[in-house]
């Protein structure tokens, strides 16, 4: 069908355009729903271990010595490692729900996993003759210990704010603040534990070696892949 216009002809189709399909929300995605249910079931099965590890972790928010004591107890340290691994996926789901990064869920999980493995590898390669092995393990595992607290806090933040229909931008800011405080606290605890065996200058060098490469790799991955 043609219609005259002063500057020419405009062709109009007789067929109506199909309406654009609405974008699938996070909760409507079946993969997210299945993973959330799986995480909930796993958390319910491991509630006893959560209660066991929570007691030694709470004092670590105020002091560094409980983190060292945690390394002396093999059963607690293994429980810590297992729970930190189990909480990794719920944390990624919470970050993905809030749109914390432009990365999709599984890519975000992969980037965070590689970042954690990079820090673990550096802690195993780096020489630490001035720092005892137990203190070194406590310092390098401080972030993984406190990650349990961060993950529970992040999941509760997303769950409660989501239930009250809080704007996603507000939830995102809340998660960023929690992650920033967690990262700062983990660095402070690492510094305190290492500084108990060596001076401030060596502590600073150790922190640079442990923290800068993983942080740089994480930032580069988000900027490049996002």
Predicted regions and their residues:
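Membrane-interface amphipathic/juxtamembrane segments adjacent to transmembrane helices
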Residues: 50-74
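Cytosolic juxtamembrane amphipathic/interface segments immediately preceding
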Residues: 16-24, 65-80
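Alpha-helical transmembrane segments with an aromatic anchor "belt"
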Residues: 100-164
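Hydrophobic alpha-helical transmembrane segments of multi-pass integral membrane proteins
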Residues: 39, 80-98, 114, 118, ...
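Long, highly hydrophobic alpha-helical transmembrane signal-anchor segments
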Residues: 1-38, 89-103
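Hydrophobic alpha-helical membrane-embedded segments
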Residues: 27-55
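Alpha-helical transmembrane segments and their helix-start/interface "positive-inside/aromatic belt" motifs
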Residues: 26-37, 79-86, 202-209
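Terminal transmembrane helical module of multi-pass membrane proteins
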Residues: 155-226
């Amino acid at each position: 069908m043609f219609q005259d216009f002063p500057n020419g002809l405009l062709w109009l189709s007789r067929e109506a355009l199909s309406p654009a399909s609405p974008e699938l929300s996070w909760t409507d995605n079946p993969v997210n729903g299945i993973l959330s249910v799986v995480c909930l079931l796993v958390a319910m099965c491991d509630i006893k271990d959560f209660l066991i590890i929570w007691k030694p972790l709470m004092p670590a928010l105020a002091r560094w010595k409980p983190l060292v004591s945690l390394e002396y107890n093999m059963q607690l340290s293994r429980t810590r490692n297992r729970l930190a691994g189990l909480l990794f996926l719920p944390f990624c789901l919470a970050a993905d729900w809030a749109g914390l990064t432009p990365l999709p869920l599984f890519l975000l999980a992969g980037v965070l996993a590689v970042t954690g493995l990079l820090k673990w590898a550096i802690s195993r390669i780096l020489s630490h003759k001035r720092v005892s092995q137990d203190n070194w393990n406590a310092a390098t595992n401080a972030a993984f210990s406190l990650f349990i607290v961060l993950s529970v806090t992040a999941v509760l933040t997303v769950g409660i704010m989501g239930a009250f229909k809080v704007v996603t931008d507000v939830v995102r800011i809340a998660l960023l603040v929690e992650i920033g405080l967690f990262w700062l606290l983990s660095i402070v605890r690492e510094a305190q534990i290492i500084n108990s065996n060596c001076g401030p200058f060596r502590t600073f060098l150790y922190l640079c070696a442990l923290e800068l490469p993983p942080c740089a790799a994480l930032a580069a991955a988000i900027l490049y892949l996002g």
